[in-house]
Amino acid sequence: FPLAAVTGRAEIMDAPGPGGLGGTYGGSPIGVAAANAVLDVIEDENLCGRANQLGNRLKQRLESLREKAPQIVDIRGPGFMNAVEFNDRTTKLPSAEFANKVRLIALDKGLILLTCGVHGNVIRFLAPITIQDSVFGEALDILESAILEASAGN
């Protein structure tokens, strides 16, 4: 169901006259009801807390690999939207090659990862917060294996 919102500073939002700011999706009571139901689920199922819990598990697993995989130079992100950044072990420069190697090894093992960042040396994570714990555990195992395998060969 269609739903849209526009936000901005008061002086801008108050500038248009009556009827001057609107759109196709304005006034859809079914869309608003659906959005309210989604907000209820987020609260009732504590999905914000779950996002923090999953994000912490991911960050802890990545942190535990730093000693064996010195290419890991940064682990960051709020909640369950995280990223790990890799540099070359020798030059200490951003390493898109290493990030891509991790991605390809993980893909061979059944885990799809996305590289990104200005230098292409970052892998970001944005999985659904409703992921089953067993599936998430399997993903963490594959990720760890891929990073360690890439590090051993680099």
Predicted regions and their residues:
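Conserved N-terminal phosphate-binding loop of PLP-dependent enzymes in the Aspartate aminotransferase
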Residues: 1-154
